[in-house]
């Protein structure tokens, strides 16, 4: 089935649907050549910290930010459009106004630039769209822009006092002349949190900073205008699986917005709901009412849905939505909503066969609308989560409830669409095929789409967004070129509603009927007439489920009359009628009447016929059941009865995973009773029961009951049994179980490995705790913490220029980090890592000389040292030399040398003895380290080391010479270059006592 990227739209046709309207392109206008577009890589958390720093503009989520979101609106004969300015270094918020009468284009450039993903301007953020509105009461322009659930504290406080961005103009600015349509018509922020003299962004819409908490953590702005001209704004509060829709109101007379009011509560679990949930859909003001339609994303990760499930719809009978909310049946709901089941319409996940956890995926291609006469249309898509599985399934669904009908018609005969807009009674699909616009239309309350327009030339477009007003489509488009600045266009497409007014008026007696299977009679008198004088109805054709029944060319247009009893699916009611061999079976059937007038114009009406089944009604005690592996007892009392008086139940058969267990032919239809304990997979529970040799093991089982009545008609019911085995939680692994760093460390980024040991289970989240306190929950692999957008998670200081120093770094000590992984069944596994933070060591110091031994009267002594620090951010302040704890000299820069040039005598004249030389190094953290050596000074001539020079030393001297021993050159007293007997006299002259000399 070919799938097109489409939009679904509706507009008025005065009660009839014409197939002959001439939809035309009325105008095409180039708005700019410089619309911002993200042309780089689609990043994730594993690489978002290293975006392209060149020309390419990398992005997170999606590449579109201009001609995206709530970006085009009309006011009188003007069309207003918002966009961001390309390229990468521009990014300004822009507002353009096109005058459809004069062709004049005016553009205002705002100082604010797109801040990028979580505050990084190098990474584009497609969710940060610009919402736009013009008050029809006072001509003020309102813009809310460039935000994604920001508050004062998240993302390192980057958005403090700037997490909500609202700009507005003075009254009447919307229709000022071209020369006066300028930036100064917008109101500056002069509050205490103003970002400067050119700040046109306001932190609240009320003007009161005391309300700022009401404007935090919001995303996706969209404005609406009520029937009396009041502006409403709705946004999403919170996150994907715990969020709420909130809305506020503009009082044009007071020129003031209210605070936001919730449609539903978030944190629903704390208010009694079994789980938290978020909304994926829209709030819209359509047909005079505020309405909501969405799919639910719950925090329950054990069901078969990967993300969203269900279709939910509600509307308010209050003119501004402040109360009186109801479901599609008109039944009151709790407001604010807590339990979403109060407004559930149906479950798209039932339209594919998968039942395993997280196997069903219904993200995207969802939207809804309501026509002017009250037809509700909802589109959705469901597919297998795993696109590679051999039994892959994908279904597009168009569910619609014609005005006056009680229930929805669910059709899978639908090619798909992405968004819906409404204005009247027709449904339109507007989209791009081959990059060029096309339009298809169907009458509201039907699924009969016909293509009525296709562009064949002109620019090829990449994407667009649209707004419909008074029968015209304002299609705001980005041309498909290249780079991060691409052209933007406005196309105005006329839907030709005037010709639709000439279409015939055709209707069934009722929009819906309900009959019992085997109904005898259904006669339908179809009303058809032309609203144009002089025209007449040429024919009326009846179709059932899109198959032609008959064409009638004369009044009355009666189908199913006495001569043709079977044509409406009835059995026949007269004695002359043979039983219908092909009566309409149980189910929902669409009757369609096509009226054609004398000018060839045609119109369609539809009716829903519900045929109630005569088959037995059969059910299990409950739809699903969980037991532990090895369960002893499972008794199932299956209910079965006939819907038709006089019939009886002949048998009920039980199947497990398609295999017959047993057929029971008498009440009660009880399986797994005491006489047959094993047939439902149980072990047995009485002393008389032997152990089941083939019990049901861990897994999911489909139980099916087939009931057959006395006429041979059968019905089935099913129950899912989950047999739980021993828990197999995810395995969590750190790269290293212990990491050691020094105090003040700049960077610590760690990727955690988490996987389930069970095939088919996915890791839904990894949560990091530091010393028992929550750090962050990551819901998208790779499970990377401490990356450049979260540099402080492991207590580091930060390492990029844009990182402010961590105000709370981890101190010296041992810290425990715990990673908790949760899988798609809700099981959790965890693992710890120990982080040891050491004090920064003092400097390393080395004295280059070993211990020194010298003789008195030595002429030189030098000591040198080298020192280094623990890291490059620390410097050496000084090295100081101490001799015997007395400072010699402190040196503040290398070379570190004492006794060298310019200081040659500072180490001379040391007395006899051993001296401690100590060098103390001091670094810029005031840490000190020391190294030491010994300097020994001996008395010259005291060869026997008795502290005097005497005859004993002279004898030792002469004996050494006789023995040829090498002597210190200092004993060359006569300076002839050798030490010999001639130096004995010199030694004698050094005798301590004069007597030695005379001797």
Swiss-Prot record:
Family membership: Belongs to the polysaccharide lyase 24 family.
SUPFAM superfamilies: Type I dockerin domain
Molecular function in Gene Ontology: lyase activity; metal ion binding
Gene3D superfamilies: Dockerin domain, Immunoglobulins
Keywords: Calcium, Lyase, Metal-binding, Signal
EC number: 4.2.2.-
Protein name, per record: Ulvan lyase, long isoform
Pfam families: BNR_4 (PF15892)
Site label Neutralizes the sugar carboxylate group at subsite +1, positions: 236
N-terminal signal peptide: 1-21
Binding-site positions, Ca(2+) 1: 189, 199, 201
Function text: Ulvan lyase involved in ulvan degradation. Ulvan is the main polysaccharide component of the Ulvales (green seaweed) cell wall. It is composed of disaccharide building blocks comprising 3-sulfated rhamnose (Rha3S) linked to D-glucuronic acid (GlcA), L-iduronic acid (IduA), or D-xylose (Xyl). Ulvan lyase catalyzes preferentially the endolytic cleavage of the glycosidic bond between Rha3S and the uronic acid GlcA, but not IduA, producing oligosaccharides that have unsaturated 4-deoxy-L-threo-hex-4-enopyranosiduronic acid (deltaUA) at the non-reducing end.
Broadest EC class assigned to this enzyme: lyase
Keyword Nucleotidyltransferase: no
Keyword hit for DNA-binding: no
Positions with a binding annotation for Ca(2+) 2: 300, 303, 305
Single GO biological process annotation from the record: polysaccharide catabolic process
């Amino acid at each position: 089935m070919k799938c097109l990227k489409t939009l679904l739209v509706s507009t008025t046709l005065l009660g009839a649907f014409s197939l002959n309207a001439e939809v035309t392109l009325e105008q095409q206008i180039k708005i700019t050549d410089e619309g911002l577009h993200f042309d780089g890589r689609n990043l994730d958390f594993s690489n978002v910290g290293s975006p392209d720093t060149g020309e390419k503009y990398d992005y997170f989520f999606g590449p579109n930010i201009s001609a995206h979101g709530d970006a085009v609106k009309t006011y009188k004969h003007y069309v207003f459009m918002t966009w961001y300015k390309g390229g990468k270094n521009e990014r300004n918020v822009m507002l353009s106004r096109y005058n459809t009468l004069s062709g004049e284009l005016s553009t205002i450039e705002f100082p604010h630039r797109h801040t990028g993903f979580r505050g990084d301007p190098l990474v584009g953020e497609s969710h940060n769209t610009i919402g736009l509105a013009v008050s029809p009461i006072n001509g003020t322009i309102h813009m809310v822009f460039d935000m994604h659930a920001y508050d004062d504290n998240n993302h390192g406080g980057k958005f403090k006092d700037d997490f909500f961005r609202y700009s507005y103009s003075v009254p009447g600015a919307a229709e000022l002349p071209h020369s006066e349509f300028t930036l100064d018509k917008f109101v500056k922020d002069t509050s205490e949190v103003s970002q400067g003299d050119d700040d046109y962004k306001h932190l609240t819409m009320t003007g009161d900073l005391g309300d700022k908490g009401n404007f935090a953590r919001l995303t996706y702005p969209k404005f609406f205008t009520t029937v009396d001209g009041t502006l409403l704004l709705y946004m999403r509060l919170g996150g994907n699986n715990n969020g709420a829709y909130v809305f506020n109101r503009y009082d044009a007379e007071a020129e003031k917005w209210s605070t936001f009011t919730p449609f539903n509560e978030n944190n629903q679990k704390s208010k009694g709901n079994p789980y938290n949930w978020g909304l994926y859909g829209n709030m819209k003001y359509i047909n005079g009412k505020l309405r909501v339609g969405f799919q639910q994303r719950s925090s329950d990760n054990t069901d078969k849905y990967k993300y969203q499930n269900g279709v939910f719809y509600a509307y308010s009978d209050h003119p501004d939505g402040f109360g009186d909310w109801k479901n599609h049946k008109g039944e009151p709901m709790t407001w604010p909503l807590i339990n979403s089941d109060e407004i559930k319409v149906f479950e798209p996940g039932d339209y594919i066969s998968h039942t395993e956890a997280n196997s069903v995926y219904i993200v995207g291609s969802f939207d809804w609308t309501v026509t002017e006469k009250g037809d509700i249309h909802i589109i959705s898509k469901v597919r297998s989560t795993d696109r590679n599985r051999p039994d892959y399934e994908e279904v597009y669904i168009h569910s619609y409830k014609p005005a006056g009908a009680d229930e929805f018609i669910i059709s899978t005969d639908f090619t798909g669409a992405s968004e819906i807009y409404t204005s009247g009674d027709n449904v339109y699909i507007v989209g791009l095929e081959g990059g060029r616009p096309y339009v298809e239309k169907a009458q509201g309350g039907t699924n009969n789409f016909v293509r009525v327009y296709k562009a064949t030339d002109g620019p090829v477009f990449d994407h667009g967004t649209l707004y419909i007003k008074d029968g015209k489509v304002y299609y705001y488009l980005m041309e498909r070129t290249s780079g991060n600045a691409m052209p933007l266009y406005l196309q105005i497409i006329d839907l030709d509603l005037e010709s639709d007014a000439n279409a015939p008026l055709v209707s069934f007696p009722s929009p819906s009927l309900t009959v019992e299977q085997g109904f005898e009679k259904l006669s339908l008198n179809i009303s058809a007439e032309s609203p144009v004088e002089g025209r007449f109805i040429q024919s009326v054709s009846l179709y059932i489920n899109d198959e032609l029944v008959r064409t009638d060319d004369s009044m009355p247009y009666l189908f199913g009359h006495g001569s043709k009893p079977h044509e409406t699916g009835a059995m026949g009611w007269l004695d002359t009628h043979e039983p219908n061999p092909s009566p309409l079976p149980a189910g929902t059937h669409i009757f369609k009447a096509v009226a054609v007038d004398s000018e060839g114009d045609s119109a369609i009406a539809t009716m829903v016929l519900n045929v109630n089944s005569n088959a037995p009604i059969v059910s299990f005690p409950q739809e699903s059941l969980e037991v532990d592996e090895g369960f002893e007892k499972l008794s199932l009392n299956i209910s079965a009865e006939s819907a038709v008086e006089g019939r009886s139940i002949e048998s009920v058969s039980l199947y497990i995973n398609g295999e017959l267990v047993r057929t029971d032919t008498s009440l009660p239809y009880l399986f797994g009773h005491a006489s047959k304990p094993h047939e439902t997979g149980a072990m047995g529970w009485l002393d008389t029961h032997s152990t089941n040799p083939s019990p049901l093991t861990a897994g999911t089982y489909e139980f099916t009951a087939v009931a057959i009545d006395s006429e041979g008609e059968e019905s089935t019911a099913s129950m899912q049994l989950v047999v739980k085995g021993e828990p197999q939680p995810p395995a969590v692994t750190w790269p290293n179980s212990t990491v050691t760093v020094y105090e003040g460390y700049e960077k610590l980024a760690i990727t955690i490995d988490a996987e389930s040991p069970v095939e088919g289970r996915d890791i839904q989240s990894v949560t990091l705790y530091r010393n028992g306190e929550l750090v962050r929950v990551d819901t998208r692999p790779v499970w990377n913490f401490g990356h450049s957008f979260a540099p402080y998670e492991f207590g580091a200081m930060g390492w990029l220029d844009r990182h402010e120093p961590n105000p709370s770094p981890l101190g010296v000590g041992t810290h425990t980090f715990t990673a908790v992984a949760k899988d798609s069944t809700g099981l959790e596994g965890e693992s710890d890592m120990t982080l040891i933070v050491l004090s920064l060591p003092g400097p390393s110091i080395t004295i280059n000389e070993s211990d020194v031994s010298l003789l008195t009267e030595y002429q030189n002594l030098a000591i040198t040292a080298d020192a280094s620090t623990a890291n490059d951010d620390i410097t050496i302040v000084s090295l100081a030399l101490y001799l015997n704890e007395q400072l010699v000299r402190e040196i503040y820069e290398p070379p570190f040398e004492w006794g060298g040039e310019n200081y040659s005598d500072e180490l001379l004249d040391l007395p006899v003895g051993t001296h401690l030389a100590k060098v103390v190094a001091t670094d810029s953290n005031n840490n000190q380290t020391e190294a030491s050596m010994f300097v020994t000074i001996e008395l010259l001539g005291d060869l026997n080391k008795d502290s005097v020079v005497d005859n004993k030393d002279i004898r030792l001297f002469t004996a050494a010479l006789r023995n040829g021993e090498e002597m210190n050159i200092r004993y060359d007293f006569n300076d002839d270059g050798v030490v010999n007997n001639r130096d004995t006299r010199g030694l004698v002259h050094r005798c301590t006592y004069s007597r030695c000399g005379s001797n």
